[in-house]
Amino acid sequence: MAQVKRIRRSISGILVLDKPRGMSSNQALQKVRWLLNAEKAGHTGSLDPLATGVLPLCFGEATKFSQYLLDADKGYETVMRMGITTTTGDAEGEMLAEREVTVGRDDLEQALPRFRGDIEQVPPMYSALKKDGQPLYKLARAGEVVEREARSVTITRLDLLSFEPPCATLAVSCSKGTYVRTLVEDLGQVLGCGAHVAALRRTQAGPFVLAQAITLETLERVHAEGGPEALDQFLMPEDSGLLHWPVLQLSEHSAYYWLHGQPVRAPEAPKFGWLRVQDHTGRFIGIGEVTDDGRIAPRRLIRS
């Protein structure tokens, strides 16, 4: 008997998942996509399998705006294990070296300021960055080490939350592209004892925070009770990740032309920058950019 093809639902919105430990970001995405029976899905930047916490998942039309969440600042809490370095910079790697930890709380507090602000980081070998088309982590697994260029990142917060040797818990707020594993390794090197990430929890991704995140267990329970449609209650609007942008409401006439790809004028628009655009009813219809001549050019549109 032929297998009946599952008809997926055309739904749109953002679901903020509290990713469980031990699952890749893509595995988490595919699991939630299956629960929602969603036609189109994408995530907004990978979390290591070891990490837990905020992972915004985009469905349907919301996937058009996932890039802007990829570029957003992130927040983390990490447990730094001093005295042990590993091949991967976290607890999943093999131990490279072990040293005695004689670091005190004051030593750690005094080391933190040099890592705040704009700093240079060399990306780890165990990362998804590519060298000549090959992901670095694949080269690392083959025993290769290649030269990586340092990258500029910004650490806006780096605070000590608790100190229980050989572990310390840190709060980190940082720009996109920051590797907390590298931050912890570099900090361990400055302290003279080495260190790795024993645990990592993302507390924020752009405007989304941990309090908004739904656990996989909750999604599975609600799905078991009410099916895919019961999970729609957890979907946020497509522009939820862009609420820090100015909003512009167009007249019915202007919205018609704008949705057909034509730049329009709006007296109340700002003089420059990106905008969330609504039609005359207040419905989000896409994002636009103010051009040099003051018109609002459509950049990404919502399919009605």
From Swiss-Prot:
Keyword terms, alphabetized: Isomerase, tRNA processing
Domain of life, source organism: Bacteria
Entry's EC annotation: 5.4.99.25
Catalytic residue positions: 48
Pfam (any one): TruB_C_2
GO molecular function, one term: tRNA pseudouridine(55) synthase activity
Biological process (GO), any one: tRNA pseudouridine synthesis
Catalytic activity: uridine(55) in tRNA = pseudouridine(55) in tRNA
InterPro entries hit by this protein: PsdUridine_synth_cat_dom_sf (IPR020103), PsdUridine_synth_N (IPR002501), PUA-like_sf (IPR015947), PUA_sf (IPR036974), tRNA_psdUridine_synth_TruB (IPR014780), tRNA_sdUridine_synth_fam1_C (IPR015240), TruB_C (IPR032819)
Role played: Responsible for synthesis of pseudouridine from uracil-55 in the psi GC loop of transfer RNAs.
Protein family: Belongs to the pseudouridine synthase TruB family. Type 1 subfamily.
Protein name (record): tRNA pseudouridine synthase B
Species annotation: Pseudomonas paraeruginosa (strain DSM 24068 / PA7)
Lineage of origin: Bacteria, Pseudomonadati, Pseudomonadota, Gammaproteobacteria, Pseudomonadales
